[in-house]
Amino acid sequence: MKVILQQDVKNLGKKGDIVDIAEGYGRNYVLPRGLAIEATPANLKNLERLKANEAKKKEQELMDAKELGAKLSGITVKVRSKAGEGGRLFGAVTNKEIAETVEKQFGLKVDKRKYELKQPIKTLGHYPITVKIHPAVSAELKVEVVSE
């Protein structure tokens, strides 16, 4: 019996795979639990359509990420913070502050978790920061921390 898996099944396959299983296993376990559907011509056609839509969606996400990466690359973000003697900040500049400043200054909304900041910035100066927008796309921007 050929079935199309609706979700990942251990020792059988991943979602969307077409697998050949025993009649009893399919009728008594896999189909009643909703783990798979029968591989009829209509269901196979539907599966192909879903895979094509998913591929288009992933391609669009990649294009959007590349576009955002191009906009972010090379920009300099000015973050104002209170500083004491020797250029040490009262507090620190974090991913959240950088994300808010980029959105305010340039209108580009990027999740704060995408900014790769090894540790918070605690002194005045220029800092290069990598933004991991998509697994395949990253951009480098500069953060300039200035005193208020």
UniProtKB/Swiss-Prot annotation:
InterPro entries: Ribosomal_bL9, Ribosomal_bL9/RNase_H1_N, Ribosomal_bL9_bac/chp, Ribosomal_bL9_C, Ribosomal_bL9_C_sf, Ribosomal_bL9_N, Ribosomal_bL9_N_sf. GO terms for molecular function: rRNA binding; structural constituent of ribosome. The keyword Endoplasmic reticulum does not apply. GO terms for biological process: translation. The keyword Ribosomal protein applies. One of its GO terms (cellular component) is ribonucleoprotein complex. It comes from the Bacteria. Keywords: Ribonucleoprotein, Ribosomal protein, RNA-binding, rRNA-binding. Binds to the 23S rRNA. NCBIfam families: L9. Belongs to the bacterial ribosomal protein bL9 family. PANTHER family: 50S RIBOSOMAL PROTEIN L9. This is Large ribosomal subunit protein bL9. The gene is rplI.
